[in-house]
Amino acid sequence: MYFRSNKQVRKEEVFMSGHSKFANIKHKKEKNDAAKGKIFTIIGREIAVAVKDGGPDPANNFKLAQVIAKAKASNMPNDTIERGIKKASGEGNSVNYEYCTYEGYGPSGTAIIVKCLTDNKNRTAANVRNAFTKGHGSIGTQGCVSYMFDEKGQIIIAKEDCEMDADDLMMIALDAGAEDFSEEDDSYEIITNPNDFEAVHAALEAEKIPMAEAEVTMIPQNYVELTAEEDLTNINRILDLLDDDDDVQEVYHNWDELIRFKVHKINGMDEKSVSFFINKSFFTLY
């Protein structure tokens, strides 16, 4: 349990900015206008499951409160959120969604975990298998790659949104049970044991500290660098196909995406441009 600071970053190192030992390389679904409909569909399913499991009151249902926060971060209208909760609470809600997880391998042994929420497991299994096959990967058995990841609570706080200084913020997090607190150029990262995530989250909320992201996630223990053009094409094909599937909730992998920003790729670019590419996950330079 310790505090790490990474304030000084040379130009040659900027492609690794934010890539701490706890850096999560979860493949996030795009949140542009074209993808909003899919994002809202996914969140709607999560609302339905959260309400079914813990009731419609977010004050007494932490899981639902988390989904609502995620919905608002994705600019989901409040009336859409409320309709989803009301629909999930009604007796006429006959759609039953189930969580399922698939594990497999991408190019050069990259590990991929796919978490889904579906009303038809046969359809979902076929679609996920197709994504791996088209990217020359393979589906494995349960547990074949999950041992390469650690399940952790992860909270990201943007510095521009937080008036509290780093030392005070660190003490609040650690006192509430956080395992680690780190500082990057523009954000703070808090890591927790999954069982302590809710307590740490509540402690930050009590201090009215805005959280840019807060979730229990899968963090790779090690990362795989892909440099061959064929490997890059194949892993992007797998991830793109999974992105297009509404049943897919989250995709975790240990491909070191940031390593693709070699020095010769970013020399001549100003820092703002490099940050834009990194922050927007724009990994199509090859």
Say what each PLM segment does:
Residues 6-10:
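N-terminal organelle transit peptides
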Residues 12-140, 145-156, 196, 253:
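N-terminal cationic and glycine-rich segments that engage phosphates or anionic surfaces
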Residues 262-282:
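Positively charged N-terminal leader segments that act as targeting/secretion signals
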Residues 1-2:
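Short, small-residue-biased leader/transition segments that mark boundaries at the very start
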Residues 157-262:
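Positively charged, low-complexity, intrinsically disordered RNA-binding extensions
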